[in-house]
Amino acid sequence: MKCLIIDVVSPAIAEELGKYMDVTTCEQLPPSKDELKAGIGDVDVLIMRVDPKIDKEVLDAAKNLKVIGVCSVGLNHIDTKYAEEKGVQVFNAPGLNGNAVAELTICKMLEQSRHTIPAHRDVTVNEKWDKYAFVGRELRGKTLGVLGFGRIGQRVGEIARVFGMKIVAYDPYLPAEIFAKNEATSMSIAEVCKVSDYITIHMPLNDETRNLFNAQSIAEMKNDAVVLNMARGGIVNEKDMCEALKAGKIGGYATDVLENEVAGDGLTADAGFRSPLFDCDNFVVSPHIGAQTTDASRDIGAHIINKVKEALNLK
């Protein structure tokens, strides 16, 4: 059997699966779609994160594929229905990066509150020492709205309560006792937008949530409210968010995701994904690093190893 690894994952995966099969790691991580199609023909196990998209073309090229191990949570980049039709089992790692993503959410919320990034630039680039230019606000006493109150959303709320924040949340799929257990008030999206000082998004990207955060929902928010997005870029309409930031209709937007994310060396317009948000003040972005901790990588790696071994009956 053959295993192909196409992204940076826990070294333990190659080490353990190498006891049962030939394991190869692509030179370019992740490869392009065409490169993957050219090299996947005799592969039994594919280990990946989110790039490239595994669509019908890729799956048709994968004549021997039996298992796809996804070292992340979302599966919107994989045609899971067609994979199932072809008998390919797909495993992801729900919940195992939850604490890492939650901590990054709090990190960005603190940064937006205390303006540490522009303050750093002002000192190191402009060579100024103006502490009065960066007056912030405390999290204590503020309201945090959580859109999507699953494992990650609940963990964010748990940490935020330590700062003295009030938690309100939207999740139509959860029973009332979950909100009560987590000391959160259940509200509609409109209500969350209206009362929150900070709103954090932890939803999957699907037809129901795409462009969920748009001009209408932004208009319902406080003018100094901050939006945090550690989920998927397509949930936030970037054009509407950019216009709101430039018009002063929102306090800030901090995200770990973009509507168009591509692999490559640098953020250039030629790369095909330059967002209008890049020209906005009060905007902070990171390159989808929510799960990028050694701790999460270790836990996810162990989970994927077990799933692959179970699927292929490897003892």
Regions found by a protein language model. Give the residues of each.
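Glycine-rich nucleotide-phosphate-binding loops and adjacent flexible coil segments
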Residues: 228
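Rossmann-like dinucleotide/phosphate-binding beta-alpha-beta segment
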Residues: 19, 132-223
